[in-house]
Amino acid sequence: MFLILLLCTDRKDMYQTLTFYHSFFRWLVLASLVLAIYRGYAGLIKNAAFSRSDNLVRHWTATIAHIQLMIGITLYAQSPVIKYFWNNKSTALKNLDTTFFALIHLILMLTAIVLITIGSALAKRRTADKEKFRTMLTWFALALLIILAAIPWPFSPLANRPYWR
């Protein structure tokens, strides 16, 4: 459905649609990471068995993050801010808001997605349940910290955007 919406819109509408979905999926990524971290912590503390539900949370957290990555990359390619940055690097580097979206946000979010991907893959391959929980908890928590720093919150000194766009 997402791709159909993009194909049926012109460039300006596509950019606005991508911005909306990227903003919406931010909350799904955050919620799924918090849930996965909670399940990792609770499973580790309680010495619980790594259940099918835990595995689904691990899997869907990574999947949601990857969907967000695809939306973000498409948005990056369409963004007038990014186009301005690459066409006017020397001037654009002096503007923190532009530099944030062109470089800082991109690098930090890519790093976070890599951490989620590695953490998910390692947790899947661990044999001991305690190690599955520990791996998921550690890698996903690191990714969450990076994501929280890289989101352009309304109160961020780097760049700010509203909670919903």
Label the model's feature ranges.
Residues 2-165:
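Membrane-embedded alpha-helical bundles that constitute the cytochrome b-like, heme-associated redox core
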